[in-house]
Swiss-Prot record:
Catalyzes the activation of fatty acids by CoA to produce an acyl-CoA, the first step in fatty acid metabolism. InterPro entries: AMP-bd_C, AMP-bd_C_sf, AMP-binding_CS, AMP-dep_synth/lig_dom, ANL_N_sf, Mitochondrial_ACSM. The gene is Acsm5. This is Acyl-coenzyme A synthetase ACSM5, mitochondrial. It comes from Mus musculus. Keywords: Acetylation, ATP-binding, Fatty acid metabolism, Ligase, Lipid metabolism, Magnesium, Metal-binding, Mitochondrion, Nucleotide-binding, Transit peptide. ATP binds at residues 229-237, 367-372, 454, 469, 565. Belongs to the ATP-dependent AMP-binding enzyme family.
Length: 578
């Protein structure tokens, strides 16, 4: 079912890419039919289509619109590495290359619809190609960050029963170390210009593959992606999204919160392993915008600012941690000729950061809030009035409320749980379930609502004000870190008798991991500073390095309940002065 082409191909899009549109407003482009479809679904006037595939029903349609002159000539994808190398694809070229990639997945890899492929790559063009190839073949992609250790990879490959993994040279040794323990793993695909024993070289196969491929017919409810999200009481859980929850669900955020059009060039600095990368892919391409990517082997403020000056980027999205770094620079030295819209999310934004950014650039920071389980739940859209410190208003089609512990809706001004109404009608832009964890899926629902686990209050004007989390998950620089994962890593060191991990305030990262440790008797007399460094390095080798405790305190005993459960909340409140 092609959602856009009908009725649009005969309309001419007058706007074209040339100079940046800063002081003038172009004529509004014709609204793509997918937007009308989304609005009809959200209003209950039209059901979610039985069949939907983002690659076929969206990307291939934009390719046709390019051919008929109904889209500006800016690329669909633009990648740079900071050393002079650039990759640009139109939607037509993206279609050609992704069909070749689809043939690689179906051919040599032998993958079929419903099979799962783990995708762990840095910011390389191959990540976007393989993501689209997964959609074309019905293969379910499982993105992961490049900092995963062998232990992390083993757990994810086993839990997801992944049949294939795609990664780069840097992570291949870790995969080799655990692949024998992953019985479902059949093929290992290497994105590299060199070969490695036991691996299939993706780039070699891509060059030789046929550009002809028939996209599989997928149902709207078929799985498109699985994300592992950190929890507080055990191993990361699997969040499953469908073709329609992402493929149709991000039309709204793309047009409203991100304010993207066919003429925009959108840069989100996120890592490919985080859900924000998928948000960008679906939001930008559903609206015909260009996705800009900088390889960013090392993320630093000057690289970001210089890139904004050098390239015609119109829309920028960074986590608050990065904006905290950017405002420490003298922003008056940088001239952003094309930048018109700035977005942030993933953690609370300090009002002073927003004020500093606006005072030096003239641009607002538009905060948004969502989860791995959802799309954008609420946000400050481009033309809305911003209340500094607020996450903005509910994003359609969500009915967002503040509820008490029994699921009763609270009046404005009352603190409670952020909740999304899922009954009598579950929003189509919502995760399917926590895979293989029906208990967790059931526990996330209360009455008519899905409970986010975050607390806030809503004011009389419908703006939401974030207060904190119900759970113990640590949100450091937008990296969600489960305390159990860090505590388990610490427990593998002989110096640690027991530990409790909580968040601790940090002026740059918002919050960081702090470990309270009770030492084994044999280590009680060791030098605290040296032991701290040793434990930090130990955690980095056992789990993803971003999880290591930046702060360590050695104490004689941990606070516990009468039943022996560690009271992380008491330690956390102590850190935050509550």
């Amino acid at each position: 079912m092609r959602l856009w082409l009908r009725g649009l191909a005969c309309q001419a899009l007058r706007s074209s890419w040339g100079v940046c549109r800063i002081h003038t407003q172009p004529p509004p482009p014709p609204i793509p039919e997918v937007v009308a479809t989304w609005e009809a679904i959200s209003l209950g006037r039209q059901p979610v289509p039985e069949y939907f595939n983002f690659a076929h029903d969206v990307l291939d349609v934009w390719s046709q619109l390019e051919k008929t002159g109904h889209r500006p000539p800016n690329p669909a994808f633009w990648w740079v590495n900071g050393s002079g190398t650039e990759v640009k694809w139109t939607f037509e070229e993206l279609g050609k290359q992704s069909r070749k990639a689809a043939n690689v997945l179906e051919g040599v890899c032998g993958l079929q619809p419903g099979d799962r492929m783990m995708l762990v790559l840095p910011r390389l063009p191959d990540w976007w190609l393989i993501s689209v190839a997964c959609m074309r073949t019905g293969v379910v992609m499982i993105p992961g960050v490049s900092q995963l250790t062998a232990k992390d990879l083993k757990y994810r490959l086993q839990a997801a029963r992944a049949k294939s993994i795609v990664t780069s040279d840097a992570l291949a040794p870790q995969v080799d170390a655990i692949s024998a323990d992953c019985p479902s793993l059949q093929t290992k695909l290497l994105v590299s210009d060199t070969s490695r024993p036991g691996w299939i070289n993706f780039r070699e196969l891509l060059r030789a593959a046929s550009p002809e491929h028939n996209c599989v017919r997928t149902r709207s409810g078929d799985s498109v992606a699985i994300y592992f999200t950190s929890g507080t009481t055990g191993a990361p859980k699997m969040v499953e999204h469908s073709q329609s929850s992402y493929g149709l669900g991000f039309v709204a955020s793309g047009r409203r919160w991100m304010a993207l059009t066919e003429s925009d060039i959108f840069w989100n600095t996120t890592d490919t392993g985080w859900v924000k990368a998928a948000w960008t892919l679906f939001s930008a391409w559903s609206n015909g915008a260009c996705i800009f990517v900088h390889e960013l082997p090392r993320v630093d403020a000057k690289t970001i600012l210089n890139t904004l000056c050098r390239f015609p980027i119109t829309t920028l999205c960074c986590v608050p941690t990065l904006f905290r770094l950017l405002v420490q620079e003298d922003l008056t030295r940088y001239k952003f000729q094309c930048l018109r819209h700035c977005l942030t999310g993933g953690e609370a934004l300090n009002p002073d950061v927003r004020d500093k950014w606006k005072s030096q650039t003239g641009l607002e920071l538009h905060e948004g809030y969502g989860q791995s389980e959802t799309v954008v739940i609420c946000g400050n859209s481009r033309n809305s009035t911003i209340k500094s410190g607020s996450m903005g208003k509910a994003s359609p089609p969500y009915d967002v409320q503040i509820v008490d512990e029994e699921g009763n809706v609270l009046p404005p001004g009352k603190e409670g749980n952020i909740a999304v109404r899922i009954k009598p009608t579950r929003p189509f832009c919502f995760f399917n379930c926590y895979l293989d964890n029906p208990e967790k899926t059931a526990a996330s629902e209360q009455g008519d609502f899905y409970i986010t686990g975050d607390r806030a209050h809503m004011d009389e004007d419908g703006y939401f004000w974030f207060l904190g989390r119900n759970d113990d998950v640590i949100n450091s620089s937008s990296y969600r870190i489960g305390p159990v994962e860090v505590e388990s890593a610490l427990a593998e060191h002989p110096a640690v008798l027991e530990s409790a991990v909580v968040s601790s305030p940090d002026p740059i990262r918002g919050e960081v991991v702090k470990a309270f440790i009770v030492l084994s008797p044999a280590y009680a007399s060791h030098d605290p500073e040296a032991l701290t460094r040793e434990l930090q390095e130990h955690v980095k080798t056992v789990t993803a390095p971003y999880k290591y405790p930046r702060k360590v305190a050695f104490i004689s005993e941990l606070p516990k309940t009468v039943s022996g459960k560690i009271l992380r909340s008491k330690l956390r409140n102590q850190e935050w002065g509550r």
